A protein has these predicted regions:
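Transmembrane helix-loop-helix hairpins at membrane boundaries of multipass inner-membrane proteins
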Residues: 1-82, 157, 161-162, 188
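Cytoplasmic/organellar membrane-interface segments at the starts of transmembrane helices
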Residues: 316-320, 377-456
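Alpha-helical transmembrane segments
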Residues: 1, 16-27, 62-65, 85-89, ...
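Hydrophobic alpha-helical transmembrane segments
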Residues: 50-61, 176-177, 360-368, 435-454
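Membrane-helix interface motif
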Residues: 29-38, 150-157, 332-347, 412-431
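Short aromatic-rich membrane-water interface segments that cap or initiate transmembrane helices
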Residues: 41-57, 163-170, 350-361, 433-439
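Hydrophobic alpha-helical membrane-insertion segments
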Residues: 18-29, 140-146, 328-332, 402-418
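Hydrophobic transmembrane alpha-helices and their helix-loop junctions in integral membrane proteins
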Residues: 67-78, 82, 86-103, 113-398
Length: 456
């Protein structure tokens, strides 16, 4: 469907893209099971497979695609339109892949479609970052392909399911997923590229690539113990870089890496509660991190910079953008009554039930860091702090609509967690709003806020 976009006028493109997302969303009602296979040379490619794990990821990717299209509606750029819809389509198709070779095809498709969003930054830095990005992403695909071939040779099939890193094939596939999930020492591409993309491109990038990797890890490596320690390290080390970073979009990129760590820990635990936590956190994260990137993208669009040292005092001129940014910041910080709280609580509780006290306290420290660098630093330096002298207009109406949709979702998920929990892979009887959970989280947030005040 994306091939028609260049031939349509601006308004027609936006309407057509939304139509494609809605049309794709009908697939969510197909039910669980295998819906489409293609036989080539006696090999069955499972093109469309759905179950209780893929469904919540597919739902939120459709939501993110819809919001991203609205967010970018002010731009008359058919190349970016094609990239956004193709990228979203590739991610959705990858979520429904039932075998490793089908996954490989769409895995690489997400790489080649998303690179154009980085090129859309239209700077020398963006062009160089895009080259590095595609090399890394194609490398991930090559590991996946090599692992798939070995897996087929060893097992007689290439079904996408539970694997072990004790096998060479499993280890190669694990490495492929780890690159896309931005594991420690494999994560440089994320902070290198996301801040260089266009304001629309960064929103799309934050939603699809890394969450596809989390889905793949949950599909194939749930309960792999080493993921607990990899994830804990991911939550920990980006905090220090985010605290000292001046570019607020790069701060959010470090923060994204930190949040992925929570999901990876949950996948490593592998219990039903933990997998629910990983999926819930990925779902909520796509929305609130997209909201934060949208708010900073609006600032970049109106002011021309996202450097903290050059911003401040914008609340007076961009109040709606500021409020939406604050809602995103509150959500990522896991304040009660917002989406981050009801998602992250599942992960923290699963750690407690498994007796992983050291990892639990590492994630508590990481949670305090999230409040510092994303919950406070982002809205404070952009919209408050010192007066920068900038007097921009409020964001365009389409940007505001997209940010308001994201804000409303952050609030609704936080207020109605039982409804949210119904789409998770496993049935769950969990109450996030018991007294101990709320009190401990408020204490953590209070002390983290106090630390920010002291350091500032």
């Amino acid at each position: 469907g994306a091939f028609l976009i260049p031939f349509l006028p601006k308004i027609g493109r936006q309407v057509y893209m939304i139509f494609l997302v809605i049309l794709s969303a009908f697939s969510l009602f197909n039910g669980f099971g295998t819906h489409l296979t293609i036989n080539v040379l006696d090999y069955n490619f499972i093109i469309n497979y759905s179950d209780n794990l893929s469904l919540p990821f597919a739902i939120v990717v459709h939501i993110a695609a819809f919001i991203t299209i609205i967010y970018g509606a002010h731009k008359d750029d058919w190349k970016e339109n094609v990239a956004v819809i193709s990228y979203a389509g590739a991610a959705i198709a990858a979520l429904h892949a039932g075998d490793l070779f089908t996954l490989f095809f769409w895995w690489e498709a997400t790489a080649f479609t998303s690179v154009f969003l980085i090129l859309g930054g239209n700077t020398t830095r963006a062009y160089r970052a895009a080259f590095r990005y595609i090399v890394i992403q194609v490398g991930s695909g090559m590991f996946l392909l090599a692992g798939a071939v070995l897996f087929l040779y060893s097992n007689g099939n290439a079904l996408l399911g539970q694997m072990s890193i004790d096998d060479t094939s499993g280890l190669l596939i694990f490495l492929a997923f780890g690159i896309k999930a931005a594991f420690p020492f494999l994560n440089g591409w994320l902070q290198d590229t996301y801040p260089e993309a266009s304001e629309v491109g960064t929103v799309a990038l934050s939603s699809f690539t890394t969450k596809l990797a989390i889905y793949a890890l949950a599909r194939s490596f749930a309960g792999t113990d080493i993921l607990i320690y990899i994830g804990a390290l991911m939550t920990f080390f980006p905090i220090f870089f985010a605290v000292i970073e001046n570019d607020l979009r790069r701060v959010l990129a470090y923060s994204l890496n930190n949040q992925l760590g929570f999901m990876v820990v949950a996948v490593g635990i592998g219990t039903e509660l933990a997998i629910n936590g990983a999926v819930a956190h990925a779902f909520a994260h796509i929305i609130y991190k997209g909201l934060l990137f949208m708010s900073m993208g609006a600032v970049l669009y109106r002011v021309g910079t996202c450097k903290a040292s050059e911003l401040g005092g914008l609340f007076k001129y961009m109040p709606i953008t500021a409020v939406c940014s604050i809602i995103g910041a509150i959500s990522i910080s896991a304040f009660p009554l917002f989406s981050g709280f009801v998602a992250k609580s599942l992960i923290m509780s699963s750690l407690g039930y498994e007796g992983l006290s050291f990892i639990y306290f590492m994630l508590l420290f990481a949670s305090a860091g999230v409040l510092h660098h994303s919950g406070i630093k982002i809205p404070f330096f952009a919209f408050f702090a010192h007066k920068s002298g900038h007097k921009p207009k409020e964001a365009p109406l389409n940007m505001i609509i997209a940010m308001v949709i994201g804000s409303v979702l952050c609030i609704l998920i936080g207020i109605f967690p039982s409804v949210f929990y119904q789409i998770l892979p496993y049935s769950v009887e969990y109450q996030p709003y018991d007294f101990s959970h709320v009190l401990s989280q408020l204490q953590l947030l209070t002390f983290a806020a106090f630390a920010f005040i002291c350091l500032w």
